[in-house]
């Protein structure tokens, strides 16, 4: 029986349209193989939306996304729009999309692929077998807390203020996502906070600990954020799933990403309690290589696989895509960002063709 899904495509800026085209071709192939019908709707976001409509997130785009089963995003931003005020820049489109879809959980995997292990800056024995999922709270914490701003005191001195705030319900909902994620993986969850200094972290630790009683099959541990950062570099294989707040997650997810050696290989997902999630590569829009057929489409393709797994409940189709990625790497196919001696240098389109062949053979 054919299953039908409505997918909003947001190619965005820079290399976005190129890598999105590869991901769509891959989805069409697995759709045929698994009797899945995709209804793709393309919409504007970021710089492309600014050029066309004057705003980074047109209301029509948000409406289209809300009516979808999932949103696949490519890349946002570029030098062209850097002179705009911060609230008018392309990146504001992503923030607006997250808020409009009420997405509060960001899932960032960091997995060492055997074929690329030497790309890591750490020793092989340290990173071999690393497979981490960072679950970051996305809409609370110090980035959104109030009061905030730069004020002038009675003495005329400038004073900058930001406020880290979390409510019990905000902690509980991200905690549930993290426990459920850990349950589907290796059953280990590490909660990262700064409870030895911050009151908000004491509440965080208390709520996560209480929530763990509902998940007796998941092993819970706690680390202070400074120790967690050190342990990610010293012994990353100890981690399975990490859950943490917005600020700490912003930092730790990038640190975990660089264990892999190439940010161009990493997908991500942003999820809410209901409604469509947004799936996108971690890397930026790379305007310097846009249109030159040099982009690495693999993170975009792996983001499509995450979409199949987490939004559409199609784990077998997701597995098929992930295995195809491993296969093309195993046969030595590389784009410039992951190229090494003796490998086959391919452009974006040719890498897509190689993926299609791998999917059709398997």
UniProtKB/Swiss-Prot annotation:
Reaction catalyzed: (2R,3S)-3-isopropylmalate + NAD(+) = 4-methyl-2-oxopentanoate + CO2 + NADH
SUPFAM superfamilies: Isocitrate/Isopropylmalate dehydrogenase-like (SSF53659)
Site, Important for catalysis: residue positions: 143, 194
Top-rank taxon, per record: Bacteria
Cellular compartments annotated: Cytoplasm
Database matches in Pfam families: Iso_dh (PF00180)
Binding site for substrate: 98, 108, 136, 226
Main location as per UniProt: cytoplasm
GO biological process entries: L-leucine biosynthetic process
EC number: 1.1.1.85
Enzyme class: oxidoreductase
GO cellular component: cytosol
Molecular-function GO terms, alphabetical: 3-isopropylmalate dehydrogenase activity; magnesium ion binding; NAD binding
Pathway the protein contributes to: Amino-acid biosynthesis; L-leucine biosynthesis; L-leucine from 3-methyl-2-oxobutanoate: step 3/4
Keyword annotations of the record: Amino-acid biosynthesis, Branched-chain amino acid biosynthesis, Cytoplasm, Leucine biosynthesis, Magnesium, Manganese, Metal-binding, NAD, Oxidoreductase
Function: Catalyzes the oxidation of 3-carboxy-2-hydroxy-4-methylpentanoate (3-isopropylmalate) to 3-carboxy-4-methyl-2-oxopentanoate. The product decarboxylates to 4-methyl-2 oxopentanoate.
NCBIfam families: leuB (TIGR00169)
Family stated for the protein in its record: Belongs to the isocitrate and isopropylmalate dehydrogenases family. LeuB type 1 subfamily.
Protein name in the entry: 3-isopropylmalate dehydrogenase
Higher taxonomy: Bacteria, Bacillati, Cyanobacteriota, Cyanophyceae, Nostocales
